[in-house]
């Protein structure tokens, strides 16, 4: 897989891109893997969802193999640890925060948490990634985003980990 990505894509060609674009490319790769390539199955055991934010974080960390970026997890530069800080030097930093849709503090976290981390890390580049496991959680996230006026925020990425994916032969 790594060789295919190196030869056929610019996935590992990071010389001309910044930390935000590199981070977004990896989040979108992870989203595609979970939603379209049966990656969602990693979050289930005996048909029941395993709702652990840490599992999603570990998968994200794997996407950074052979990178020129400095990728650090649980960086605490003040007022709490952000899930990931990806940087190339001091002037190019991006924060990535993962959340489960089932998180009871989801609205509060989306509204405030990353902005606090941005200030502590001297950056304004960040994204929030939210994983949901069913239609109820999906609607909850959409309602929260609507209430906060963030429905069209491109820095908030939703990932569908529902186990209701239909086989291509049944579409």
Name each region found by the language model.
Residues 1-65:
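The feature marks a conserved, polyanion-engaging helical scaffold used by nucleic-acid processing enzymes
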Residues 43-171:
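Catalytic core segments in nucleotide and nucleic-acid processing enzymes
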